[in-house]
Amino acid sequence: MNKQRRSQLSEIVGNLEVLKEGLEELKEEERECFENLPESLQESEKGQQYEENADDLETACDDLENLIESIQEVINR
């Protein structure tokens, strides 16, 4: 791979890392909303929705991290 394509991939990795940080912040906000609910409301539909949203955002963050690692492997070859 030439220097220009490596540079383009590095820029993409940087953009993905910014997106991942944004998702992590939103995940934490959802998790805090859930944890700040009284216990009786945590088991309500709304509470379960907060928890499910946080879990799905965590999965998305993990997927993005895997993508970033895969691209970095290509850059480092």
Where on the chain are the PLM-derived regions?
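Long, low-complexity or tandemly repetitive, helically biased scaffold regions used
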Residues: 1-77
